[in-house]
């Protein structure tokens, strides 16, 4: 099976993506996997929609696509409409290429999200991407909410997590939470 990872620098980093690849190999030991790493720093959903063909779909029929763009869509100042259109561009194009493709949307955390999450508010960019996930009935993993809750409970600090570009501990938290959703899916 072909598994692709489309996103920004957090996806490009050695970390959660590599951990998920290893987990999938253990989860499906008789499957020959091709992993497509399509993380490019500072790219959100609009650049992702434009590079989907060359960076992901040209590599073969994709069975599972992980997509994340919340941090960069927010950082790069894309409007709500641009955030929705960019993410929907990725999802629609991916599903046209393979209607049976599984797509999992991920929402990572960065500094400006924390005060909102601590007040029980969801960052607008996550709500905008969730509109797309809900419309297409896609599973999504709100890692921003998960990590903020764990920090509020005192499990670890932002510094211990590693910040926006997590250290290995932070990536392990991301991978463990994603794996819980994979447990439900497969």
Question: Where are each of the predicted segments found?
Answer:
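Catalytic nucleophile-elbow at a beta strand-turn-alpha helix junction centered on a G-D-S/GDSL motif
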Residues: 1-15, 40-44
């Amino acid at each position: 099976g072909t598994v692709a990872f489309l996103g920004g620098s957090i996806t490009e980093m050695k970390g959660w993506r590599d951990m998920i690849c290893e987990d999938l190999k253990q989860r499906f030991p008789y499957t020959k996997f091709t992993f497509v790493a399509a993380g490019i720093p500072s790219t959100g959903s609009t650049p992702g929609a434009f590079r989907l063909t060359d960076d992901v779909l040209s590599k073969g029929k994709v069975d599972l696509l992980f997509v994340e763009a919340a941090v960069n869509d927010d950082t790069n100042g894309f409007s709500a409409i641009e955030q929705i259109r960019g993410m929907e561009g990725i999802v629609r194009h991916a599903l046209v290429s393979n209607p049976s493709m599984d797509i999992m949307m991920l929402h990572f955390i960065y500094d400006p999200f924390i005060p909102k999450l601590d007040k029980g508010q969801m960052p607008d960019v996550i709500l905008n991407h969730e509109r797309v996930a809900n419309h297409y009935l896609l599973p999504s993993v709100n890692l921003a909410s998960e990590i903020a809750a764990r920090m509020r409970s005192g499990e670890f600090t932002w510094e211990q997590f590693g910040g926006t570009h997590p250290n290995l501990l932070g990536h392990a938290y991301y991978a463990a939470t994603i794996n819980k959703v994979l447990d439900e899916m497969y």
